[in-house]
Structure formats: structure tokens, C-alpha cells
């Protein structure tokens, strides 16, 4: 039971980040590698703020807005400086490595085990029934993930959200509506990286420490979650894409845990497993698309 809870907990955390990747990959068709930097940015800022006595609750929205700023930088480099999308993300991701170290006080690892977090505080320790306490982490994570999902669903149904979708499908349509397609892309990248930073902040609070390598492979996990979720659950017409992405993140985490449990590979091979599963998902996804096109 504890293992299953752990899978759900990590799946929900990465689902928040995957919602951001959904914006860049599925909506904007933008290969944004800066999430590998904004994810640890949120973790570093959260750890730094909590160590300085800031409320762990306030640390999360501040982490989100830090990610928004980083996403804006990626967008400005791409739109205003005319740098290719892939390179824009790489530049910001690389720069954020140093930024994250500075935020963490030039420490590659910043623990805050003795500080309160959203998961471990006076309220969770003393005000909850004993029967609920083992599940408090997954409950809080589910609430945060669902809030992010519903906010994103709401935004995508606003005028700005429709323009964001149009910018990915047909940017000429955005121009015909007298809107700046570059500005729309910047907004999309800002929101996406905001989600990534928020997820990093949540993970840092769950682990009660920040590590500089926490963002390695974040983009791969996000892509796998988006592709797995949207491809596997696309047959359910009434299921929203954001719901499919969250389910995909949890399912992907289960796949990784299953492979490790088989003892064929070691836990230290986690990144290798992650990459291999993503490759398998991409191959199967491409095969399904070809079959669909052939039958059509």
C-alpha cells in the first residue's frame, strides 16, 4: 500500500509539470527544454524561502511566478531575438543552473527537514484524525493537481486561451485577428514554465530538500506523460486532455516502478528506464498513427 501511495504521490507531482509540457508540446508545438531548469528553479526558491522562515504555502505561488518569469525569458529570446525554439530553451535551461545555485546559497543540496511544509505542519500533525494522516500527502497533492487542471481548463476556454490554441494550430489566424502571435507564444511559455516551477516547489516540500540535479530528465517525463495520456485515453471523447495528461503521468510513474520492481535493472538506472519507456511510447504512438492513417 505504501508503494502504491508513493507512486500516486510522485505521479501527481509530475502531473502538474506535465500540464505545462502539454501547453508547449501539444498546443504550441514548441520543444521547450527550459522546463529542465524551471522545475529545479521552483524547488530551489521554495527551499530558500522556507529556510528563511517564509510560509510553505506562500512559497508555492512565488515559485510559480518565478517559473512564469523564466518562461517569459524563453519566449522573448525566441520571439524578439529570433532564436530557434529549441535553442531558446537550451539557453534558459543552462542559465538557470547557475541561477538555481545562487538561490540555494551556492549549495547543490539544501535540506530543510526541521521546517514546516504543506505536508508536515502543526495542522497535519495535530488536527487530523489518525486514520487520515497516512493519506494526507496524496490528498494534498490531488487537490493541488486538480486546482491546476481546472484553472488550465478555464483559461483554455477564455479568449486568450483560444488564441493560444490558434497560435499552435494556425498562427496566421492569430495575425488575422489583429493579435500578436509572438505575445501569445510568450504567454503560453510563461504559463507552462510556471506549472513546471510549481511542481518543483511541491516536490521539494515533499522531500524536504532541494538538489541541483532534481530537474534532470524533467522534459522526458513530461513528454512521456503527455503522449501516453493523450494517446491512450483519446478514445474517451468526453475525457478532457488535461485529465488524460494527469492520468498519463500517474500511469507512466507506475510503468517505471514496475520495471524497477522486476529487478532486471537497478534503481540507479532510473533515467535509462525513463528514456527507454519514452522511446517505446513514441514507437507505439507512431505505429498507431500510421495504422489509423492507413485505415482512413
Task: List where the protein language model places each region.
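Transmembrane helix-bundle core of multi-pass membrane transporters
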Residues: 85, 91-92, 96-157, 187, ...
Amino acid at each position: 500500500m505504501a508503494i502504491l501511495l508513493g507512486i500516486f504521490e510522485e505521479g501527481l507531482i509530475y502531473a502538474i509539470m506535465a500540464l505545462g509540457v502539454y501547453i508547449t508540446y501539444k498546443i504550441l508545438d514548441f520543444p521547450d527544454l527550459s522546463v529542465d531548469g524551471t522545475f529545479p528553479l521552483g524547488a530551489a526558491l521554495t527551499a530558500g524561502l522556507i529556510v528563511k522562515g517564509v510560509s510553505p504555502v506562500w512559497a508555492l505561488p512565488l515559485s510559480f511566478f518565478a517559473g512564469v518569469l523564466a518562461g517569459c525569458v524563453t519566449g522573448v529570446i525566441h520571439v524578439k531575438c529570433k532564436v530557434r525554439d529549441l535553442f531558446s530553451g537550451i539557453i534558459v535551461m543552462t542559465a538557470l543552473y547557475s541561477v538555481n545555485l545562487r538561490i540555494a546559497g551556492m549549495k547543490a543540496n539544501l535540506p530543510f527537514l526541521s521546517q514546516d511544509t504543506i505536508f508536515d505542519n502543526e495542522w497535519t500533525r495535530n488536527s487530523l484524525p489518525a486514520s487520515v494522516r497516512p493519506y494526507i500527502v496524496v490528498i494534498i497533492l490531488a487537490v493541488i493537481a486538480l486546482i491546476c487542471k481546472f484553472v488550465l481548463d478555464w483559461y483554455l476556454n477564455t479568449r486568450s486561451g483560444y488564441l493560444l490554441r490558434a497560435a499552435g494550430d494556425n498562427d496566421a489566424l492569430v495575425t488575422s485577428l489583429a493579435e500578436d502571435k509572438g505575445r501569445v507564444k510568450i504567454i503560453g511559455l510563461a504559463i507552462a514554465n510556471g506549472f513546471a516551477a510549481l511542481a518543483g516547489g511541491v516536490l521539494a516540500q515533499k522531500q524536504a530538500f532541494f538538489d541541483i540535479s532534481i530537474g534532470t530528465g524533467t522534459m522526458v517525463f513530461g513528454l512521456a506523460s503527455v503522449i501516453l495520456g493523450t494517446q491512450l485515453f483519446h478514445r474517451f471523447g468526453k475525457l478532457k486532455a488535461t485529465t488524460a495528461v494527469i492520468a498519463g503521468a500517474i500511469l507512466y510513474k507506475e510503468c517505471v516502478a514496475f520495471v524497477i520492481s522486476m529487478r532486471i535493472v537497478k534503481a540507479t538506472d532510473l533515467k535509462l528506464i525513463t528514456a527507454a519507456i519514452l522511446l517505446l511510447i513514441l514507437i507505439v504512438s507512431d505505429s498507431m498513427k500510421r495504422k489509423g492513417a492507413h485505415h482512413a
